[in-house]
């Protein structure tokens, strides 16, 4: 099966990243990379990896908090996050610009807090994008002339 345009871009960015970061002696031993699955986690991972390949900064933001075992209570307890409610899934700096990316797959929709957050980012001069697939992210990059191909 032939790769799509965005898969070719992903592969090319990965190849360039490998050439820059690894010695020539081991280049042929590094496996090729496959596109992650089209789930919310897969799309998020592919965007973050692609940004890393390109030398941009990108990080996943967890706003749900975490679980921790409480030895006194002898049970798992929920620890609230310090992140702002409604924060985007991915915070990135792409070519010097703050870009917040919300990943929505399937029937997932934005909450009111997420809409407020998006407006706050835009008012501050940042970019906020909602993507449903890596293809959406690819199209954003294409519209900004930020592709390697």
Q: Residue locations for each model-derived region?
A:
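Catalytic phosphate/metal-binding cores of nucleic-acid and nucleotide-processing enzymes, i.e., regions
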Residues: 1-149
């Amino acid at each position: 099966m032939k790769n799509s345009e965005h898969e070719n871009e992903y592969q090319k960015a990965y190849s360039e990243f490998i050439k820059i970061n690894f010695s020539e002696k081991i280049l042929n031993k590094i496996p090729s990379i496959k596109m992650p699955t089209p789930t919310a986690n897969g799309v998020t991972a592919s965007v973050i990896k692609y940004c890393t390949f390109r030398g941009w900064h990108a990080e996943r933001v967890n706003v749900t908090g975490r679980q921790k075992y409480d030895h006194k209570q002898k049970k798992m307890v929920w620890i609230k996050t310090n992140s702002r409610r409604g924060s985007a899934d991915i915070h990135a700096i792409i070519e010097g610009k703050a870009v917040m990316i919300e990943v929505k797959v399937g029937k997932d929709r934005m909450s009111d807090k997420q809409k407020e957050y998006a407006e706050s980012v835009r008012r501050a001069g940042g970019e906020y994008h909602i993507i449903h697939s890596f293809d959406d992210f690819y199209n954003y990059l294409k519209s900004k002339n930020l592709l390697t191909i």
